[in-house]
A protein has these predicted regions:
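Small-residue-rich helix-interface/hinge motifs
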Residues: 9-101, 106-183, 487-516
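PDZ/PDZ-like peptide-tail recognition elements
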Residues: 199-237, 272-333, 338, 379, ...
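Functional transmembrane alpha-helices
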Residues: 2-4, 175-198, 313-339, 344-347, ...
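Alpha-helical transmembrane signal-anchor/signal-peptide segments
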Residues: 36-44, 227-244
Length: 553
């Protein structure tokens, strides 16, 4: 049974990963495609997936395709990369001429696939028309020695055979269609670089812009399905098993009325009251019960009590609520606490040389460590023996609270506010989450550049994203939609960075051109793009390797 569940979880993760990344990349490339089409730029192919084509359908001048590997996709925009000249070293060509106008140009003259197409000696040609005269032509000599200059259709195509072709004899049109491929020529006025600076920028911005729009939509849908927190009342949503609140008997739809501790009763009218009262509890030193007065789902007034659970998020260390000792709950091997030498089941006896008798003492000790690079020393008892001087460096308060949306140290009861399903609140939540996601990305980027706390080793690659997507899928459609939106914001933001291989780099080239009054040379652009592309590829390999190591450990 467990094997079936595990298999089902893996399949769910794979499907969710493909769907989530597929949607994000399809929307991103769709943004480029829409603006390119708007400005009259040739888009030869719009593809979902990478690798060999599985199916395709040509509509107009664009080939819409689905490829073998459903990760990624692309929009082939003419002029985005340097255009190759297939006729560069050609002395002969085969031409399909209709009504005196060249429609197809074949440079693979020895291929049996095209042996029935007339062969010409090539004298001169212009298929680019850099001056935008509107005239494309080829001067050729036929088999009888007659020289002629023929116009070339602006939508003419190069003919070539697919990689699958093995020099077979072509016996019917079906076989020809299977192996013959076409590649439409791109006159200068149909290429990206021929367009105005603002138009070029919009084509590049189009992808990230669509990612941001997608994020707002899915954040909105996530809030509409999962609900928006209703913090104006003290009614509870689902209470998670294993939390202090659950163990104390609190359940969904119960309404909290008051907290009492250390001789004081605090009336609760909204969620802000709950938060501020927990803050008051944290200010004290004695780890006492909180007596909670509440109204249950049947409308009966009840009383229960609990001790908040301590979470030291800055090192990912948590209280074992099933023990009366200062016992550490199960640790993740990737946590700072584990890497420093703390283990599940350790009983903490000292922090920074001071005796601790409760988890609230531990809370206060770590609460004081707010700055980057400050170490905390712990003594623990493990299996009856002392293990002293375990040194751990927590994440700073600033880093943690700006990137994780939770406090670096916290007292957890295990409750959350009830939710409301409201159209306008959900829409507002979509924009709010979009803003906070971008703000988090900007702050994280700043940390990568100017902080020692976060480095390349902390980034996640495809394997890490797969793992997190799988976890999101298991939490339900609302959370998966939120995760899709968060990833979409990330991809949109990253693509706007001024790195030549990314959209932001192409925008940077346009800005440099506007300042210099002269375009960056194609050669310089190509070198910069290739160098940064391979650097990014190396980075992906490195973070993927780290992802795998984390999973193995």
């Amino acid at each position: 049974m467990n094997m079936i569940l595990t298999f089902g979880t893996v399949v769910l993760g794979i499907v969710a990963f493909i769907v989530v990344l597929g949607i994000i990349i399809l929307v991103h490339e769709g943004g480029h495609f829409l603006f390119a089409r708007k400005y009259g730029i040739l888009c030869r192919e719009f593809s979902f997936g990478m690798g060999p084509q599985l199916v395709h359908h040509k509509k107009g001048e664009t080939d819409y395709s689905i490829r073998a590997f459903p990760i990624g996709g692309f929009c082939a925009i003419a002029g985005e990369e340097a255009e190759d000249n297939p006729l560069k070293d050609s002395k002969q060509v085969r031409l399909v001429i209709e009504n005196g106008i060249i429609q197809k140009i074949c440079f693979e003259i020895d291929s049996k696939l095209f042996k029935d197409i007339p062969l010409f000696d090539l004298k001169e040609y212009d298929l680019f028309d850099k001056e935008d005269t509107g005239k494309l032509y080829m001067t050729v000599v036929d088999a009888n020695g007659g020289e002629m200059t023929l116009p070339v259709d602006k939508a003419a195509s190069y003919l070539f055979h697919s990689k699958m072709y093995k020099k077979q004899e072509i016996k019917d049109s079906k076989t020809y269609k299977k192996y013959a491929k076409e590649f439409q020529i791109a006159p200068h006025n149909r290429t990206l670089n021929a367009k105005k600076k603002g138009q070029r920028v919009m084509v590049m911005v189009g992808g990230p812009m669509m990612n941001f729009i997608l994020a707002i939509i899915v954040f909105f849908l996530s809030a509409l399905i999962g609900g928006v927190s209703n913090t104006t009342v003290t009614t509870l949503s689902e209470v998670s098993n294993g939390t202090p609140a659950y163990e104390a008997g609190l359940r969904e739809d119960y309404e909290l009325e008051s907290f009492t501790f250390r001789g004081n009763e605090y009336t609760l009218e909204n969620w802000e009251d709950i938060s501020s009262t927990i803050d008051k509890y944290a200010e004290g030193n004695d780890y006492v019960d909180i007596v909670i007065k509440y109204t249950d789902a049947a409308g009966e007034e009840q009383t229960t009590s609990l001790k908040p659970m301590v979470a030291i998020y800055s090192v990912s260390m948590y209280q074992d609520i099933n023990s009366d000792e200062v016992k550490v709950a199960e640790l993740d091997s990737s946590s700072k606490a584990y890497k420093a030498g703390v283990r599940t089941g350790d009983i903490i006896t000292k922090v920074n040389g001071e005796d601790v008798s409760t988890w609230l003492d531990v809370y206060h000790s770590f609460e004081q460590v707010t700055d980057e690079g400050v170490s905390v020393t712990m003594d623990v008892t493990r299996d009856g023996e002392s293990v002293d001087d375990i040194s751990v460096i927590p994440y700073s308060k600033d880093l943690f609270e700006k990137t994780q949306a939770v406090s670096y140290v916290d007292l957890i009861i295990g409750i959350s506010p009830s939710v409301t399903h409201n159209l306008w609140k959900s829409l507002g939540d979509g924009f709010t989450k979009m803003y906070t996601s971008i703000k988090s990305m900007i702050f994280t980027l700043g940390l990568l550049i100017g902080s020692n706390e976060v480095g390349v080793k902390d980034l996640s690659g495809p394997v890490g994203i797969f793992s997190m997507t799988s976890s999101a899928a298991q939490r339900g459609i609302a959370y998966l939609l939120y995760w899709l939106g968060f990833l979409s914001v990330n991809i949109g933001f990253i693509n706007l960075l001024p790195i030549p291989a990314l959209d932001g780099g192409r925008i940077l080239f346009v800005i440099i051109e506007a300042i210099r009054k002269k375009a960056v040379s194609e050669k310089a652009q190509t070198i910069a793009i290739n160098v940064t592309y391979y650097a990014l590829l190396a980075l992906i390999v490195y973070v993927t390797f780290n992802d795998v190591l984390r999973i193995v450990k």
